[in-house]
Amino acid sequence: GVPQQLVDRYGRTVRDLRLSITDRCNLRCTYCMPAQGLQWLPTPDLLTTAELTRLGRIAVERLGVERIRLTGGEPLMRRDLEEIVEALSALRTSAGAKPDIALTTNGLGLEKRAAGLRAAGLDRVNISIDSLDPQDYAAITRRDRLADVLTGIAGAQEAGLDPIKVNAVAVPATVEERAPRLLAECLRRGWQLRFIEHMPLGPRETWSSQDVVGVDQILEVLREAGFTLTEVGRPDRRPAALWRVAAGSALGQEHPAGTVGVIASVTAPFCSDCDRTRITAD
């Protein structure tokens, strides 16, 4: 039969489901978590593979969801991730299509699992990296693991999980230095960079509107560094507004053409046409 649609009271139809499959993480990013003393959910409280599959089945077969994104915590911390991906990939929409399955990850351990995840039906990955400078990365994440993340990305590319999208949180102290370097490096490596405005997450009382580097400021920093940007807009109601970057030179180095995105959830919220919903790990 024709699926029912999941429509909220504002008339927004849900097409995109975010499944958080764990609250655990192996990094301790300063804007997200305290350095220590975190209480994780007891394992029996986390949704099981069967429960996640059942939720996915209802969403895809009966409610018209077309895209599923697995998030955490860090989803690679679940040993049954391949099983979860395989079960969700086997679902079919009412039109007979496989749902698009994506993973948001910090990339640690991805090199060992990328091929298996691809074989299980994973379509693409978003990797969270706020800096490609090892010391800077260690200061942000409180873990010296950048080399492992880069190995993880190489594994994902080898497995055919292209294009690689990189998510970076923009914070005021370092945006002028960090953002242009990160964009130049991502363009050279063929990765699609998305800056994310710093949202009120993480330890209580640690967020203030002073911490937000808005989309206009990010663009200004990039243009001042020498990048030529042309607005593309927000394709398919996705959260990221995109700009085309012309090939040229910035920071004294050549770079190829590409795109850069900004997810401006604080300064330019896109709630009115949002088509996603989230289920937490418990």
Predicted segments, located by residue:
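Canonical Radical SAM [4Fe-4S] cluster-binding loop centered on the CxxxCxxC motif
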Residues: 10-49
